[in-house]
Amino acid sequence: MRTPGAGTASVASLGLLWLLGLPWTWSAAAAFGVYVGSGGWRFLRIVCKTARRDLFGLSVLIRVRLELRRHRRAGDTIPRIFQAVAQRQPERLALVDASSGICWTFAQLDTYSNAVANLFLQLGFAPGDVVAVFLEGRPEFVGLWLGLAKAGVVAALLNVNLRREPLAFCLGTSAAKALIYGGEMAAAVAEVSEQLGKSLLKFCSGDLGPESVLPDTQLLDPMLAEAPTTPLAQAPGKGMDDRLFYIYTSGTTGLPKAAIVVHSRYYRIAAFGHHSYSMRANDVLYDCLPLYHSAGNIMGVGQCIIYGLTVVLRKKFSASRFWDDCVKYNCTVVQYIGEICRYLLRQPVRDVERRHRVRLAVGNGLRPAIWEEFTQGFGVRQIGEFYGATECNCSIANMDGKVGSCGFNSRILTHVYPIRLVKVNEDTMEPLRDSQGLCIPCQPGEPGLLVGQINQQDPLRRFDGYVSDSATNKKIAHSVFRKGDSAYLSGDVLVMDELGYMYFRDRSGDTFRWRGENVSTTEVEAVLSRLLGQTDVAVYGVAVPGVEGKSGMAAIADPHNQLDPNSMYQELQKVLASYAQPIFLRLLPQVDTTGTFKIQKTRLQREGFDPRQTSDRLFFLDLKQGRYLPLDERVHARICAGDFSL
């Protein structure tokens, strides 16, 4: 799209013809012709198709910016904002625990968090100290980090699935002075107790008898019952740019990293979600996501903390209870992530799926292949798909329901929100540079790395990084938009269409090249999963000795050994190109997922198609016979020797 050139040419022609003495109507008509001929018509088309969307997005951006500016000038923090909300509506339900039925009003959440703040100050903790929080998602989880924040103490929110070395690593890198763990996590803490050091204070919360408490652990609940519940006489000198808590990355590509969440980032994420999807003051939000991640704790719980919505928590997603919970608690907004929507679709059809009041589903990772099936099947009018990591400064949101899109950036107002797709070497993920040393922007339709220009003075564009300086530096590139600037590297490849809609491409390693073609793992996964009734599927490329590229391999959940590979292959041939059909199959009891329901492929890729690495059933596609054959050590050796044509 050559809008600057088109505009310049049309204005120049208008002036020239006017100087030659032609009537202005003729001059204008000629100038318009030059404009259209120079590519301007495409620009007008884009304006007509996207103006409404872009203006709404601009209004959201301005609204969030003004709210943040007001809170910064007032010296607010997230706890202060919450206290104002609690004072306005003390008796409204703030948090509901769907697992236990326990309900907390805003006054109760405020009182509990006040007790936490007073207790830890009495124990000698000072603003800036770190306390690790390790318990399942329930109201106490929110009250603990909120209370610590009231005292200026930074909470390190630990993934409840961590065990042994990763758990000890996360505790060590956080520099925590204390650990608060739930009774349900006692066994996990016991496994690493010798690695934690005697200086680490331990507090246990929840239903756990004194005889079951680990040595050197104090019972937190009785201590909180004795602590003052009045607001702190003097709040710590904290502001919107100070640290609120740490959230750990999922660790799918290595050990988890502690991402720094400052008060303004918490506000920004929650506010963008609230305004982008027009949430209402009387909404009830269903949050079954982990609270140790930003989707559940900021996008979800943030609606309670900042805007006063009621949030219904369930500590662990349950496909069979999802819609029952929504009906029971009159939920109007639900959250999803990863494969949750697919899990819901594969449940038996029940009447309750249509008796709910849910109008909006907010999240990320909804596959385009099941997008409309989900909205039509469950009667959910709006999907609020968004893209953004906890620490990133280039989040985007799909505000108008464009199927398959994870968000947009305006093609008209490109500089209002300075993010960009840049060309990269997809093997190394290093940005490519032009002759001036700047990154090369992608054209519509070209896949590129999403980057966001950094401005530490702007709460919408700052990048706070990680506790580890080296990890932070790896995510920053310089001279990206212009000489001397800096930008955040998302690590994710997206594609933008002509209208500015962006579509998520797989992370590096999730596409592979086979028979001269690029194979999208998500596309193959979606096809296989649909053929098999929304079964869990992981698709990845594996190297075969002496063969160029990588062969496709599919790991399929088959807990009851019911899958017939060759019946599946007959259907697969109808819907997948030959180069995309998996050469290898691995049938296993279940496919590993992360705590946020993303497929884990690291171990599967490492073990490949070697039967010595697994007891799972393996199959190999013999192209001559046109069928999958069992793959044992003898067949494996023949494949590696090149006896089969792949």
Swiss-Prot record:
Listed InterPro entries: AMP-bd_C (IPR025110), AMP-bd_C_sf (IPR045851), AMP-binding_CS (IPR020845), AMP-dep_synth/lig_dom (IPR000873), ANL_N_sf (IPR042099)
Topological category with respect to the lipid bilayer: Single-pass membrane protein
Coiled-coil positions: none
Chain intervals for the UniProt region annotation (Sufficient for oligomerization): 191-475
Transport in keyword set: yes
Major localization listed first in the record, in broad terms: membrane
Reactions that this protein is recorded to catalyse: a fatty acid(in) = a fatty acid(out); (9Z)-octadecenoate(out) = (9Z)-octadecenoate(in); hexadecanoate(out) = hexadecanoate(in); (5Z,8Z,11Z,14Z)-eicosatetraenoate(out) = (5Z,8Z,11Z,14Z)-eicosatetraenoate(in)
One GO BP: biotin import across plasma membrane
Extracellular side: 1-13
Keywords on record: Cell membrane, Cytoplasm, Fatty acid metabolism, Ligase, Lipid metabolism, Lipid transport, Membrane, Nucleotide-binding, Transmembrane, Transmembrane helix, Transport
Location relative to the cell: Cell membrane; Endomembrane system; Cytoplasm
Residue stretches spanning the membrane: 14-34
Summary of the tissues where the protein is detected: Expressed in muscle.
Segments on the Cytoplasmic side according to the record's topology features: 35-646
Gene3D superfamilies listed in its UniProt record: 3.30.300.30, N-terminal domain of ligase-like
EC class: ligase
Function: Mediates the import of long-chain fatty acids (LCFA) into the cell by facilitating their transport at the plasma membrane. Also functions as an acyl-CoA ligase catalyzing the ATP-dependent formation of fatty acyl-CoA using LCFA and very-long-chain fatty acids (VLCFA) as substrates, which prevents fatty acid efflux from cells and might drive more fatty acid uptake. May act directly as a bona fide transporter, or alternatively, in a cytoplasmic or membrane-associated multimeric protein complex to trap and draw fatty acids towards accumulation.
Assembly and interaction partners: Self-associates. May function as a homodimer. Interacts with EPRS1; mediates the translocation of SLC27A1 from the cytoplasm to the plasma membrane thereby increasing the uptake of long-chain fatty acids. Interacts with DGAT2 and this interaction is enhanced in the presence of ZFYVE1.
Name of the featured protein: Long-chain fatty acid transport protein 1
Organism per entry: Rattus norvegicus (Rat)
The gene coding this protein: Slc27a1
